């Protein structure tokens, strides 16, 4: 099976208001704009016991094993949404990490949107938003 290719665009916060804070996430209001800078995500189903997630590119060095993409798949597994499907994901990073451009968040959001729109997973928009909020404050901002 060949890889599918997804562009995961950076986002720019034009205005940001933190409404409330918790230990892990902030409740925010934001005005965003997507920019032409993007990471490239390659994804395909595989026969494996686990998902294979890898990052490469100039801005991949500091990405650890616990990241927004691995967190997304952990949530999908725990909610039994994937139904034992496994994926290989290769992400070429062009968006600098820790730069406020939402690179990691947008990677997870792009994958979630892809899986839903291609009907690889059966999920309603309301559930997608709940999952997005578990991963990051700014994920629910994306156009799921």
Please name every model-derived segment.
Residues 124-135:
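Short, well-structured alpha-helical segments that form the helix of a local strand-helix-strand
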